[in-house]
Every structure is written in structure tokens, then in C-alpha cells.
């Protein structure tokens, strides 16, 4: 990583860390929060985004007991690997002209869905039983969260482009 990019890693990591710590209840005993994988992938690139997201998740698990130590591996895979990959692919494919903002939105949307589908699959594989109603409600909540993630990510990226164009 170029030394000139180090401030961007710190600032974007701190922003996503703080945003992830703001949880809002979505029912069924769960909460939602900004994921930030797309925001990090677009501003830092996929490799740096994965490293920063992993650091965020480790600090949250070890210091703030958010996410849990036992779930750390799954969370890193879901958000720092799959989430970043799902976010970066549309951005990489369509990062030009009129398709730029829709690509960023789609990447953010897909990052949430990838993480959600993987989390549900991991829970099911671990023996957690979920009824059809719970799965249906969860899917609806994940879709709403994915749309919000896309809107917020595009808004933050556009603001960054106006203030710090060399960061995006």
C-alpha cells in the first residue's frame, strides 16, 4: 500500500467502525447496522478493504464484545471476504460514466445480501432451526437493509469525491 493512502485507511476504517457500532433493532431478536464492505472496497481497493474490515471486526469482538469471538471467523469471511468481493465486482466492471453510481449501489446491495445469505446458511449448518416465516421476514429485512446500504454508500462516496477526490 502506498504511504500516501495510509490516512485513507485510518479514516475510512474509523468511519466504518463507528457506523457499525450504531445498531438498530429489526425484530426477531436481531439488529441491523451499516456493513461498510462496499464503502471500503471502493475507497481502498479490495485487498486493503479486507484487511481494514478484519481489523474492525477483531476490535469489535475482542474489546466491545460485539459480534462475538466465536463468530469472528464467520464474520470475517462474510464481511471482509465475501462482502468485499461482492461489493467490488460490480464497481470494477462498471466504474465509469453513468454506470458508476449504480455500480456502487449494486455492490453495496450485493455485499449485504452475500453476508446475509452466508450468515443464514452458517446458522442452518450449525443446527439452528428457522421456520419459513422467520426466513421470509429475515429476507425482507435484509433487502431493506441492502437498499439502505446502497443509498448510504453512494451518498458517502459522492461526498468523498467532492471533498477528497484522490481518495476515491
Language model features: what each stretch is:
Residues 1-9, 133-168:
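Alpha-helical transmembrane segments and their cytosolic interface
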Residues 1-39:
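Hydrophobic transmembrane alpha-helices
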Residues 77-119:
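Short helix-perturbing small/polar motifs within transmembrane alpha-helices
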Residues 21-29, 55-85:
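Interfacial aromatic-anchored transmembrane helix boundaries in multi-pass membrane proteins
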Residues 2, 63, 67, 71, ...:
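Membrane-interfacial segments
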Residues 19, 23, 59, 63, ...:
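Alpha-helical membrane-inserting segments
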Residues 39-48:
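Alpha-helix C-terminal capping segments
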Residues 6-11, 35, 50-54, 77, ...:
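Hydrophobic alpha-helical transmembrane segments
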